[in-house]
């Protein structure tokens, strides 16, 4: 451009066009990670959050609590990795696990709803899946992960089909949950 102002105007115009096309994937501007953006949003809306995570093994809770002041909105989490713990400690119905398995939409819905009720939070989220490298079945390959968001008005689920790499799956699923929170907030 001929000048800084003209160049800035062109960048702004193109940014608006880009936002129109991929806005759902933009969570902020600058260098703030999504967990910080979500934390600020929860604070601003005076909402609380709880987590039940299986395949992510606490990584999602780690991301949330890595932000200073997260205790103002994050009340706690459970990591019910085992079937028995999912039933006894979290409260997933045995018949749900028997009929659908741990890596299923009905199970993840129960997990998100139950953790929200147990912790008495505005929002409950959950993860369950096959992070890998083992544990796959023909209908549930490595990288199959269910995530859920629950508040008093709605429960939203997503089925992810990620990679064969365990750490990539754990990280990607955790970020996907944070994005699901962002997209689902009232």
Q: Where are the predicted features?
A:
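Short beta-strand-to-loop capping motifs
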Residues: 1-2
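Short alpha-helical segments enriched in small residues
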Residues: 5-186
């Amino acid at each position: 451009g001929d000048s800084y102002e003209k160049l800035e105007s062109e960048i702004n115009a193109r940014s608006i066009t880009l936002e129109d096309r991929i806005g759902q994937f933009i969570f902020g501007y600058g260098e703030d990670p999504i967990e910080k953006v979500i934390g600020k949003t929860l604070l601003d809306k005076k909402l609380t959050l709880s987590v039940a995570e299986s395949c992510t093994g606490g990584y999602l809770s780690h991301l949330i609590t890595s932000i200073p002041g997260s205790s103002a909105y994050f009340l706690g989490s459970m990591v019910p990795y085992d079937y028995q713990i999912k039933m006894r400690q979290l409260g997933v119905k045995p018949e749900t696990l028997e009929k659908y398995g741990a890596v299923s939409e009905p199970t993840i819905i129960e997990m998100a709803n139950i953790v929200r009720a147990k912790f008495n939070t505005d929002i409950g989220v959950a993860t369950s899946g096959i992070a890998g490298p083992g544990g796959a079945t023909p209908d549930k390959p490595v990288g199959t992960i269910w995530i859920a968001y629950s508040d008093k008005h709605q429960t939203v689920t997503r089925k992810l089909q990620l990679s064969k790499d365990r750490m990539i799956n754990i990280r990607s699923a955790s970020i996907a949950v944070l994005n699901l929170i962002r997209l689902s907030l009232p």
